[in-house]
Swiss-Prot record:
It comes from Mus musculus. Residues 1457-1470 are annotated as: Nonhelical region (NC1). Residues 1-476 are cytoplasmic. The gene is Col17a1. It holds the Pfam family Collagen. It is found in: Cell junction, Hemidesmosome; Membrane. Residues 146-231 are annotated as: Necessary for interaction with DST and for the recruitment of DST to hemidesmosome. InterPro entries: Collagen, Collagen_superfamily. This is Collagen alpha-1(XVII) chain. It is a single-pass type II membrane protein. It comes from the Eukaryota. Residues 75-96, 111-120, 170-184 have a biased composition (Polar residues). GO terms for cellular component: basement membrane; collagen trimer; extracellular region; hemidesmosome; membrane. Residues 498-1470 are extracellular. The lineage of its organism: Eukaryota, Metazoa, Chordata, Craniata, Vertebrata. Residues 597-609, 827-848, 891-914, 940-949, 982-992, 1166-1175, 1201-1215, 1253-1262, 1434-1443 have a biased composition (Pro residues).
């Protein structure tokens, strides 16, 4: 029933609408935030902002309150109705079922408002419910407090008003009580009688008209009633329709009980929880407090807006303790926040029930926009004095006691806090809306506020359920479903029974009729017969008198029968008319009810909305609201403050700023003054243009640093802010602040510029000196390979011979890490494996085996140098070979040491016998791979394969690349590919000892020990690993001359060209093409004629032969070493902790330094040449030692302490460990330590130290033609500089544990053969792979799957070191061990320790000082790469905008701007 009347009050014409509504609503649950409860987004909007038709959609009583008039509401609730809104997305929370029928009549008038439609002003009182009001208050005192706090005017003191409020019938006083200290105004006259204030459902539907606090309801409705869980059950569009039944999707209740849209109908976010835009609603923008915003969960952000701009009374100040009480509401964000913030449910509980759970309500004071948290935000604050509310409650509940239980149905929940002994005291479900949501807080939602949101019908246990709190919503739901099913079953059964009964009745009636008819017929017949029989007896003379009684009776019977017959036929019927009355019953009142809802809608729209129209203008700000979100960024603005200085500069640019003014008056010009700009702010009004200026600022950030300077024009934007004074401007202003804030963040980014420094690390990359050599490789480098030749002699140790046998196993070596097609494993190392070679036969290597014999031809490999010519000629061949790691010459020799791996590698060496196969020697040309570095890269040797014929000589070769090169004969380079580097990784752990000095000492000890004859003899077999020295030394021509790879390359190229292959020799030629050409018999013949085959490089392969290395008694060796150490006074363990550093391994420079500094300098010699691993070839040429070192530093090697000794660098990382602990550990775990030490010693790098340059093995290159081919294939892949060469087989891990992260073992990163290029990978993967010891450490294992003990050893060492820091500790205490580790450092540079180590040793011996010069090159490399990172720097430029942010503040000076800012802050606070 809606009655509208106008009256004048205080000279103000007020239209009061008295809405009498009977609303039966059951709020099953609040919609989750972000979802609209009933999916009607419209519900919230009340016909445009223009009409502030406030529907106080209180749960209990939904009344329309016409904002235009003050609203007085009497709500009497009678009966409960459960409405379920299917549309609502609300989770059903068991706890809250708001089921109540509220009959409320409100008079809505805004008294004291300057105009009926004026937006209410809110007194700057904070509305905070405080549960502290424990004492019951008389209604009068409560009202008085409320009036005092809320009413701006003194009118509240008027006695008549007070009396009015006190009227028992009307003073349910839904408006929540407030503490005087912080409360939002509550209409003093709220006479909302929500008699059914069921626990959480009691909603204060009040609207505050700030202007007229005394008005019954200010424009803001307190529709806080909804427990969070039960936010408007479903809001129907009715709000606009004004059918108040927002909650009921069914719309049964005309008044939407729930979800009171704020005065801002538009915000009515209540209705659509989903509306985030309404978020501002929360904090109602100017008085547009979508009080119901609570309802819109989606507006969680709105809650942030909570403190909307001034006058943001969060209408839902009413808080229900139940909500606050549920501590468990994990969904508190959704429900509690909403409940507390938006809907503070009145606690209908006993007044004194303190809110057990302090829910902090954030309420923005109208002015400050600060958020006050009433600590006992518990809803209890709204507790009504018992006498008033309690009475009403009692009255309301009297109607339906069973529903008295919490709306949420969990009285128990409430009881948990303060057991409400009487139904009256339903605590609002603590969960209140605790939103159990689905995952709502467990708790509580007390009634599962979230889940069912008080979802009456669904989740909450009925009030009468004794276990309301213990039954989870789903149990109730299940129970309800089962109950419904049962009822349905009964219903259908009854229907069926009824049908059967009906049929039976019909049957009986039919039978009875039949019987009666039959009887009648018989009677009729008998009567007729009787009459007819008697008639004759009647004489004509008979008179009536003669009819005796019998005759008369017969006639009578006859007539009666006829009448009966007629009657049965229906001829006599006609009385039915009365039944018409029955028809009248057809129209049922129920339908009538729907009509009533319609009525409310029209009423709502009338006058009330009109007033809100003004607020509608505020709605525009609402648009800004989204900007408000940027406001969040605004905080960045503070960062901007530092910017201010920048802004000063911008001031200069202020000139540009003037452009901003263009839009508006010159005012923008002042920006130059910007310091003064604050004052201009006011002038801002033109600012509207200003905002554009701001946009310009945004552009500046894009510019990055420079544009930042342009930022100054941004200041003009500030003037624009002045413009913001225009209401519309405000939004713009907000936007500006936000933008500024963002730039601020970028400012922070600015520091990223530092990244450029990282570029320096890139220099370290240069360290990959080898890379630089690579370029030269094409020609000059070959010379270096000659150096490797010396190593070759070591290879000669004959140990290679053994490897030869193993050469076959080498084939497995190939398996070791092929990344795919590139099966080549660094042949070099295999050299020793050569012995293993026999296995080679199993694989393609088998063929290589024969080549093994040709291995000697390896020397021819030297012709591989001609391969270098390839490079020079087009560098395609040399590059290919280098990339492939194929060593034309003996390079394989170094691999020899690796021999052990060799087994894993192609068995080729084994085949040595079949030197004939040596023919593969042709691959030797790849030897050009050596490119610039004299040190032979294993790869290049491959080409020498042609020398294969000499393959007989290959015997030496066997040691070299044996297994790996597989087809060394094809190209000693295969040995290069072998690059056992992987084993090396273990070494790094040694570095740990941050004790750089100690690290050197240790290295010294170990070096001495290893150099000692007995150890060297003992370990000689081990040498195989060195294979890596792929860089076969100089190739010896048939004439015995040192053959220059470049020459060989040139010759081969010339030959190929003369053979008509010239076109294919272009630099663009693929490795496959070159390989194909090299494989040609004629080419092989040619190469054989010119190549002797890889020289001794294999020498290292002490393992050679039968793979003695594998059979080596590491336990014994470890004991020797330990004894040696102990005898040398070296203690274990102290350094232990450092272990981690090992990974870093030693930088190239450090290693060089260490080696040079060590006594074994002679042993180590300057292997520098390894750099040539030029496999990268060109890359090498561009990389200097400095570059490499810088790279290593960048890769983290830099962290390694200066001590050149490889150990030193690792040391830093080591520090983490506790040396003492290590020593203790060593003592306790001597066995483990010994095993680790053994693994470490057996690691290629250490072995290389021990063995010394494996060079001699080179010869083994010859092994297996097939291997060579495979090597070519493999190397070609690796040559891609994917760094696949060694580690490629393992995939990104790299043999050495991702020796190069992504890079191949030797290809480190993109790839130098030794990883000198380090590209992304870094030698040992220190760069990307995480170091051989890194996560990819297993790669070793993978690469050599079981083929080499070294792989396993390396893995073991790397893992154990990293995991236990054992060796690292040892490195600490036993500087010596670290020394070997040093090689690991190199590993970063080079995939394979052993080869690299030997190369380095040779290089150092020959070029002990060379490393220095590379350092210079390093300088060149550095910064550039890192520079790229510099880009981050651009972000820095945004920084300048930050200052603008400050200017934005000036904008804030503009009142509106300030307001916007405040909103922002508000949004943030929530």
């Amino acid at each position: 029933m809606d009655v509208t009347k106008k009256s004048k009050r205080d000279g103000t014409e007020v239209t009061e609408r008295i809405v009498t509504e009977t609303v039966t609503t059951r709020l099953t649950s609040l919609p989750p935030k972000g979802s609209t409860s009933n999916g009607y987004a419209k519900t919230g909007s009340l016909g445009g902002g223009s009409r502030l038709e406030k529907q106080s959609l209180t749960h209990g009583s939904s009344g329309y309150i016409n904002s235009s008039g003050s609203i007085r509401g009497n709500a009497s609730t009678s009966s409960y109705r459960r409405t379920h809104s299917p549309a609502s997305t609300l989770p059903n929370s068991p706890g809250s079922t708001f089921e109540r029928k509220a009959h409320m009549t409100r008079h809505g008038t805004y008294e004291g408002s300057s105009s009926g439609n004026s937006s209410p002003e809110y007194p700057r009182k904070e509305l905070a419910s405080s549960s502290t009001r424990g004492r019951s208050q008389t209604r009068e005192s409560e009202i008085r407090v409320r009036l005092q706090s809320a009413s701006p005017s003194t009118r509240w003191t008027e006695l008549d008003e007070v009396k009015r409020l006190l009227k028992g019938s009307r003073s349910a006083s839904a408006s929540p009580t407030r503490n005087t200290s912080n409360t939002l105004p509550i209409p003093k006259k709220g006479t909302v009688e929500t008699k059914t204030v069921t626990a959480s459902s009691h909603s204060v539907s009040g609207t505050y008209d700030s202007a007229i606090l005394d008005t019954n309801f200010p424009p803001h409705m307190w529709s806080s009633t909804l427990p969070a869980g039960s936010s408007l059950g479903t809001y129907q569009n009715n709000i606009t329709a004004q059918s108040t039944s927002l909650l009921n999707t069914n719309a049964y209740s005309t008044g939407s009980v729930f979800g009171v849209p704020n005065n801002m109908a538009s915000c009515s976010p209540t209705l659509h929880p989903g509306l985030s835009s309404c978020s501002s609603v929360f904090g109602m923008q100017n008085n547009l407090a979508p009080s119901s915003s609570v309802l819109s969960h989606g507006t969680t952000t709105a809650s942030t807006a909570y403190g909307a701009k001034k006058n943001v009374p969060q209408p839902p100040t009413v808080t229900s303790t139940g909500v606050s009480t549920s501590a468990t509401c994990t969904t508190s964000v959704q429900s509690d926040d909403l409940l507390h913030k938006d809907c503070k449910f009145l606690i209908l509980e006993k007044d004194n029930t303190p809110a057990k759970k302090e829910m902090e309500l954030l309420i923005m004071t109208k002015d400050s926009g600060k958020v006050f948290t009433a600590s006992p935000a518990t809803i209890s604050s709204t507790s009504f004095s018992e006498d008033t509310l309690k009475k009403e409650k009692q009255a309301a509940y009297a109607a339906d006691t069973c529903l008295k239980a919490d709306v949420n149905g969990d009285l128990n929940t409430v009881s948990t806090k303060s057991k409400m002994t009487s139904a009256e005291n339903h605590g609002y479900d603590r969960g209140g809306g605790g939103g159990r949501g689905k995952g709502g807080g467990a708790g509580g939602g007390g009634g599962g506020g979230g889940a069912s949101g008080g979802g009456g019908a669904w989740g909450a246990a009925p009030a009468w359920c004794p276990c309301g709190s213990c039954c989870s919503w789903w149990k109730w739901l299940l129970g309800l479903l089962l109950t419904w099913l049962l009822l349905l079953g009964l219903l259908f059964g009854l229907i069926a029974l009824a049908e059967e009964v009906r049929k039976l009745k019909a049957r009986v009636e039919e039978l009875e009729k039949t019987k009666v008819l039959y009887h009648d017929v018989q009677m009729d017949k008998s009567n007729r017969d009787r009459l007819q029989a008697e008639a004759p007896s009647l004489g004509p003379g008979l008179g009536k008198a003669e009819l005796d009684g019998y005759s008369q009776e017969a006639i009578w019977l006859f007539v009666r029968n006829k009448l009966m017959t007629e009657q049965e036929n229906g001829n006599l019927r006609g009385s039915p008319g009365p039944k018409g009355d029955m028809g009248s019953q057809g129209p049922k009142g129920d339908r009538g009810l729907p009509g009533t809802p319609g009525i409310p809608g029209p009423l709502g729209h009338p006058g009330p909305e009109g007033p809100k129209g003004q607020k509608g203008s505020i709605g525009d700000p609402g648009m800004e609201g989204p900007i408000g979100q940027r406001g969040l960024a605004g905080p960045m603005g503070p960062r901007g403050e530092p910017g201010p200085p920048g802004s000063g500069e911008k001031g200069d640019r202020g000139i540009a700023g003037e452009q901003g003014p263009q839009g508006l008056p010159g005012v923008p010009g002042p920006p130059g003054l910007r310091g003064h700009s604050g004052s201009p702010g006011p002038q801002g009004p033109p600012g509207a243009v200003g905002p554009q200026g701001l946009r310009g600022d945004v552009g500046l950030p894009g510019v990055k640093g420079d544009k930042g300077l342009m930022g100054p024009p941004g200041p003009k934007g500030d003037q624009g802010e002045k413009g913001p004074r225009g209401l519309t401007g405000e939004p713009g202003i907000r936007g500006l602040p936000g933008a500024v804030g963002e730039p601020g963040a970028k400012g922070a980014m600015g520091p990223a510029g530092a990244d450029g420094q990282q570029g320096s690390r890139g220099e370290q990359g240069l360290t990959g000196m080898p890379g630089t050599r690579g370029p030269p490789g094409p020609a000059g480098d070959p010379g270096k390979p000659g150096l490797t030749g010396p190593q070759g002699p070591q290879g000669l140790p004959g140990s290679p011979g053994r490897p030869g046998t193993k050469g076959e196993p080498g084939a497995p070596g190939r398996v070791m890490t092929s990344e795919g097609s590139s099966t080549i494993t660094v042949p070099g190392p295999p050299g020793p494996p050569g012995a293993m070679g026999p296995p080679g036969p199993p694989g393609t290597p088998g063929p290589a085996g024969p080549a093994g014999l040709p291995g000697q031809q390896g020397p021819r490999g030297e012709p591989g140098l001609a391969g270098d010519s390839f490079l020079s000629s087009g560098s395609s061949i040399s590059e290919v070979l280098s990339a492939q790691g194929v060593d034309l010459r003996g390079p394989p020799g170094p691999p020899g040491p690796r021999g052990p791996p060799g087994p894993s590698i192609p068995g080729p060496p084994g085949p040595r016998g079949p030197p004939g196969e040596g023919v593969p020697g042709p691959p030797g040309p790849p030897g050009s791979f050596l490119t610039d570095s004299e040190t032979f890269f294993t790869g290049p040797p491959g080409p020498p394969g042609p020398p294969g014929p000499k393959g007989d000589q290959g015997d030496p070769g066997v040691p070299g690349t044996p297994g790996i090169s597989g087809g060394l004969s094809h190209g000693a380079s295969s040995s290069t590919l072998y690059m056992q580097g992987p084993p090396g990784p273990p070494g790094p752990p040694g570095p740990p000892g941050s004790l750089s000095s100690s690290g050197q000492d240790i290295q010294h000890y170990i070096a001495e020990y290893m150099q000692s004859d007995n150890i060297r003899t003992y370990l000689s077999g081990v040498q195989g690993p060195p294979g890596p020295p792929g860089p076969p030394g100089p190739v010896i021509t048939i004439t015995g001359e040192t053959f220059d790879y470049s020459q060989l390359a040139s010759q081969v190229v010339s030959y190929l060209r003369s053979s008509g292959y010239g076109a294919g020799l272009s630099s663009a030629s693929s490795s496959e093409d070159i390989l194909a050409m090299l494989r040609r018999n004629d080419v092989w013949q040619y190469l054989r004629q010119n190549l002797v085959g890889p020289p001794g490089p294999p020498g290292p392969p002490g393992v050679s032969g039968d793979g003695s290395l594998l059979s080596l008694d590491y336990g014994e060796l470890s004991r020797h070493i330990l004894n040696y150490m102990s005898s040398s006074g070296i203690s274990f363990g102290h350094p232990g902790p450092p272990g981690p550093p090992g990974l870093p391994g030693t930088s190239y420079e450090e290693l060089l330094t260490m080696l040079r500094g060590s006594d074994y300098r002679n042993i180590i010699g300057p292997p520098g040449p390894p750099g040539p691993p030029g496999m990268p070839g060109n890359a090498w040429s561009s990389i200097s030692v400095e570059d490499l070192s810088s790279y290593l530093h960048t890769a983290g090697l830099s962290s390694i302490p200066g001590p050149p000794g490889p150990p030193g660098p690792p040391g830093p990382r080591g520090p983490p460990g506790v040396s003492a602990a290590l020593s203790t550990y060593a003592a306790e775990n001597s066995d483990n330590f010994r095993s680790e030490l053994i693994s470490y010693l057996t690691s290629p790098d250490v072995r290389s130290f021990i063995v010394g340059p494996p060079g001699p093995p080179g010869p083994q290159g010859p092994p297996g033609d097939g291997h060579l081919r495979e090597n070519y294939n493999w190397s070609s892949n690796s040559s891609a500089r994917r760094g696949t060469s060694y580690s490629s087989s393992t995939g990104t891990g790299g043999t050495n544990g991702g020796s190069l992260g992504e890079g191949g073992a030797y290809g480190a990163g993109d790839g130098g053969p030794y990883g000198t290029d380090i590209g992304p990978g870094g030698g040992y993967g220190a760069a990307a792979g995480g170091g051989i010891y890194g996560t990819n450490g297993d790669s070793f294992r993978d690469g050599f799957t079981g083929d080499l003990d070294y792989n396993k050893l390396a893995v073991r060492v790397s893992e154990s070191m990293q995991r236990q820091g054992l060796l690292q500790g040892m490195a600490y205490t036993v500087q010596g061990p670290p020394g070997p580790q040093g090689p690991p450092g190199i590993s970063r540079v080079f995939s394979a320790y052993s080869n690299v180590t030997q190369d380095l040793m040779d290089f150092f011996q020959t070029y002990g000082t060379i490393p220095g010069p590379p350092g210079q090159k390093g300088d060149v490399g550095t910064p550039g790469p890192k520079g790229d990172r510099g880009p981050a720097g651009p972000r820095g430029p945004p920084g300048p905008p930050g200052p603008r942010g400050n200017k934005g503040e000036k904008g804030d000076k503009g009142d509106q701007v300030y307001t916007g800012r405040r909103k922002r802050s508000i949004a943030i606070k929530p």
